């Protein structure tokens, strides 16, 4: 499932590349045919929320072509795995030297933004930016700023990778170059047959993807189901599995959904809000209210997760064979990622400076404009709407296996109808694991 988002490109409209592939369909193109991806998760959030604008939107994708997929690998059972540590002056620090690659490569699904803050939180002082490739590389540090003995390289996605889906990039690169990537749960289900991945940390408990509408035009609408009752046209990236779920379950009707959305905000503005549209709750509301000339007023929205498509978003995933090969690495690294999620929520200022520095150095080259106001809105919304949160327990970053199995039950028939080939009999244990989660870390 391709999770794409809408953006302003240097002010208002999308660059041609973004208009073609960015923002929100659920179908990822073949490896030969680049596509943009981005993504979702679960937690309770208000049915309607008024807010400013800039968002992302997911989308389904076809399995990448011309890439060799490894044999099916059984996901490890959920267990607790302590990390080796060594004391330093700044406190007890994890040493990843000799356990992880010298540089831990993480492939993102989009350009730098607040939704990626928890991995940028791991970048220490003295980082370097490769503007041509849109990479940020620096020492991988713990919560106290202690270096762990390895570097981290964060690779931007979207236009920087020719809009290739993260799943494709994980198979096109050696693990020593790209060990991890952002893979949404529904995407993992879609590609589980031919290009399997296993997520080792959940990222976002709740998917930021939403449907938004103009509350002035539709004052009686409080959620997506009301849009269905009113017969409002809803634009989305064609092929999105969640939309097939909405139409198949009767929440929306097939004659009111329009799969022509390309990420360009101009249509929403031009039709004066008579149509609804997909987006990211942590972005578009701010963009539309504060930055898009011609609109500059609030939109209302409801998260897709709240209607039963309980997708985890921005999950940190790897190829299945890496679970055993890099088990000691993950045992030390995953708790650092968990803690980084908490640290970023509590004090995002320094990490946002890294994100904005990256945008300043290479954003324009890839048609990406991201402002300090959008970053601040993003982190505020991530906290307020519970997009990053503990699971049903007191642990951050772990997976609810029943929830994942519930999404599998919904998603497999949809993907098969779309022509994808999910793993026969796929279960939660095939695509996610809590093996490396530290149960003592939570919000």
Task: State the predicted function of each range.
Residues 2-10:
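Bacterial N-terminal signal peptides that target proteins for export
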Residues 24-33:
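Bacterial lipoprotein signal-peptidase II cleavage site
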């Amino acid at each position: 499932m391709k999770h794409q988002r809408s953006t302003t490109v240097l002010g208002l409209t999308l660059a041609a590349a973004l208009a073609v592939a960015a923002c929100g369909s659920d179908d990822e193109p073949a490896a030969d045919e680049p596509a943009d991806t981005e993504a979702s998760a679960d937690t309770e959030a208000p049915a309607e929320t008024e807010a400013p604008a800039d968002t992302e939107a997911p989308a389904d994708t076809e399995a990448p072509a011309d890439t060799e997929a490894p044999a099916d690998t059984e996901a490890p059972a959920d267990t607790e795995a302590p990390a080796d540590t060594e004391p330093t002056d700044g406190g007890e620090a994890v040493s990843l030297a000799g356990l992880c690659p010298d540089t831990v490569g993480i492939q993102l699904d989009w350009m730098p933004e607040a939704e990626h803050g928890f991995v940028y939180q791991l970048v220490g002082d003295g980082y370097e930016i490769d503007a041509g490739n849109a990479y940020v590389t620096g020492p991988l540090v713990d919560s106290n700023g202690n270096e762990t003995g390895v570097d981290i390289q964060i690779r931007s996605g979207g236009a920087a990778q020719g809009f290739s889906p993260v799943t494709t990039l994980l198979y096109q690169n050696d693990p020593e170059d790209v060990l991890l990537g952002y893979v949404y749960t529904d995407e993992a289900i879609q590609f589980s047959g031919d290009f399997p991945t296993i997520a080792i940390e959940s990222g976002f408990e709740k998917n930021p993807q939403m449907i938004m509408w103009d509350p002035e035009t539709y004052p009686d609408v409080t959620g997506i189901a009301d849009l269905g009752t009113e017969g409002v046209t809803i634009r989305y990236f064609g092929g999105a599995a969640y939309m097939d779920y909405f139409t198949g379950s009767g929440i929306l009707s097939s004659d009111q959904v329009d799969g022509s959305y390309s990420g360009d905000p101009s249509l929403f503005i031009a039709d004066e809000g008579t149509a609804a549209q997909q987006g990211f709750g942590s972005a578009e509301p701010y963009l539309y209210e504060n930055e898009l000339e011609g609109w500059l007023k609030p939109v209302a929205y409801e998260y897709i997760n709240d209607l039963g498509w309980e997708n985890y978003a921005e999950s940190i995933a790897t190829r299945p064979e890496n679970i055993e090969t890099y088990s000691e690495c993950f045992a030390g690294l995953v708790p650092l990622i968990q803690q980084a999620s908490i640290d970023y929520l509590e004090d995002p200022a320094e990490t946002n400076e890294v994100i904005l520095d990256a945008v300043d150095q290479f954003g324009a080259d890839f048609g990406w404009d991201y402002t300090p106001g959008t970053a601040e809105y993003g982190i505020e919304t991530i906290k307020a709407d519970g997009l990053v949160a503990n699971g049903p327990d007191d642990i951050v970053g772990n997976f609810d296996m029943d929830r994942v199995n519930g999404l599998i039950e919904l998603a497999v028939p949809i993907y098969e109808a779309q022509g994808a080939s999910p793993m026969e009999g796929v279960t939660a244990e095939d695509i996610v694991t809590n093996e490396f989660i530290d149960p003592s870390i939570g919000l």
